[in-house]
Amino acid sequence: MRIGILGGTFDPIHYGHIRPAIEVKHALALDKILLMPNHIPPHKQQPNLTTAQRLNMVADVCSQLDGFELCDIEAKRDTPSYTVVTLEQLKALHPEDELFFIMGMDSFLQLKSWYEWQRLFNFAHLVVCQRPGWQLDAAHPMQQILTARSHAHQETHEGHAKNTHKNSGQIFPVTITPQDISSTQIREQLAKGEIPADLLMPITLDYIQNQRLYLP
């Protein structure tokens, strides 16, 4: 099975998360996508909502999307959500499956600042999405890693048959439709009493309004 993994604060989850995940799922013929809320994001400030509230919103979204599932492995953890630890645990749970960890180009450019980033490739492939406003310069130090581990490059240089059974360690660049949406933007609109109906799934907006979340 080919399993995509998209982690994030999801504070709240919105179309800027969902639409790229759907595009990646189709582009790479993934069997399912795990949406994985962080508990203690190492690279971000603490979220505005409780972990339980964010889990509820993501679970609601997954109930509406075919092939999407909630993954609460990080939300249950009492220590920082380091990606390499999470992927190691997920690989132990899915030893025969291919894991595809989804990230944006902005995160990929900061990859060397991640805890034990080199070990990520032991457990999963990386899917690098092209987001609005980011373009990797040919001279950027991450370009060498992107080229050396790109799926297309390894297919060309090592042969298709050899890579057919390689279930981790490659990078899959995927061009996605620009989604200029941010959780900060949504929270600000909600705090002003605006209804960002075009940015959120209806089930998410209903939950936010029923729970009276993000009010000033």
UniProtKB/Swiss-Prot annotation:
A single Pfam family, by name?
CTP_transf_like
Q: What is its EC number?
A: 2.7.7.18
What InterPro entries does the annotation carry? Cyt_trans-like, NadD/NMNAT, Rossmann-like_a/b/a_fold
Arranged from A to Z, the UniProt key words for this protein are: ATP-binding, NAD, Nucleotide-binding, Nucleotidyltransferase, Pyridine nucleotide biosynthesis, Transferase
Q: Which reaction does it catalyse?
A: nicotinate beta-D-ribonucleotide + ATP + H(+) = deamido-NAD(+) + diphosphate
Q: Which residues form a coiled coil?
A: none
Q: Which pathway, metabolic or otherwise, does it act in?
A: Cofactor biosynthesis; NAD(+) biosynthesis; deamido-NAD(+) from nicotinate D-ribonucleotide: step 1/1
In its keyword annotation, does this UniProt entry include Secreted? no
**Which GO BP terms apply?**
NAD biosynthetic process
A Gene Ontology molecular function term for this protein is: nicotinate-nucleotide adenylyltransferase activity
Does this UniProt record's set of keywords contain rRNA-binding? no
Question: What task does this protein carry out?
Answer: Catalyzes the reversible adenylation of nicotinate mononucleotide (NaMN) to nicotinic acid adenine dinucleotide (NaAD).
Q: Which PANTHER family match?
A: NICOTINATE-NUCLEOTIDE ADENYLYLTRANSFERASE-RELATED, PHOSPHOPANTETHEINE ADENYLYLTRANSFERASE
Give the similarity note: Belongs to the NadD family.
Q: What is this protein called?
A: Probable nicotinate-nucleotide adenylyltransferase
- What organism is listed for this UniProt entry? Shewanella baltica (strain OS223)
